């Protein structure tokens, strides 16, 4: 429904953990990732003022040493970018080796670069070509082609797209530096909006999402890869509501009437969006959100 194709796909819900899995992956999955797909439509941007970059690195070094609870309050108050909430408590430094798996055009890595991080790699097998901009390097690679060891491997809404998530996480674990961590951000099938909207929930994103996990299935998935969950944070947003409401009304995400295309033509007014924003803040605080970040570290007893 993102592009209005209205094709139908079948998912099975695990009776044990509640995760959703795509029954049959389309033979030509690439047609569902057209050039305008949002992961590839934003150029890499980089902070290029040396003095400003030095100041950002100094601030990053301070914030990265703070406990996650304090970092969360800074982010909630608008005094620090949200990416610090993701990496809080991991012992990273601005020179940490960070790779974003399924990086698309690298816009998220550019956000890290603006905050003073200096060793940033994005890998994506669907990139047209390798590219570089300042401290951000993009390479056309799959994770099993990645070499070296890394302090942080990130899957920012990419793990749910791969055909074999357990194998992908095992490959990530094998590339971790000592004391390294894996960050997985993705939708959750046991969240409030997922249960409320069912097949019209935007988080399914068929057929691009080959699976949509739950809390229980993430624990199982991590264990199969020799990992354990160190921390969970929640970051759902109002799109889970207004986009799902559009799907109920047969309005695709990128339709001219969609809120994300033209808020002025949307059926939703500021009061409704504000209400959903408020609901999302509540769901995030209560752990009932439809999107979360899982910080994974090696399980010590894994052989």
Question: Language-model segments: which ranges?
Answer:
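Short catalytic/ligand-binding loop motif for oxyanion handling, primarily in non-cytosolic enzymes
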Residues: 22-23, 30, 107-109, 191-194, ...
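Short glycine/proline- and charge-enriched loop/turn segments
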Residues: 197-205, 246-252
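Conserved alpha-helix/loop element of class I SAM-dependent methyltransferases that forms part
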Residues: 58-63, 67-95
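N-terminal juxtadomain amphipathic helix
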Residues: 1-57
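Residue-level detector of anion-binding/catalytic polar loops
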Residues: 20, 118, 228
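A SAM-dependent methyltransferase catalytic signature shared across enzymes that methylate proteins
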Residues: 216-235, 269-272
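Conserved SAM-binding loop
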Residues: 80-200, 207-224, 291-300
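A C-terminal cap/extension of S-adenosyl-L-methionine-dependent methyltransferases
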Residues: 2-4, 234-303
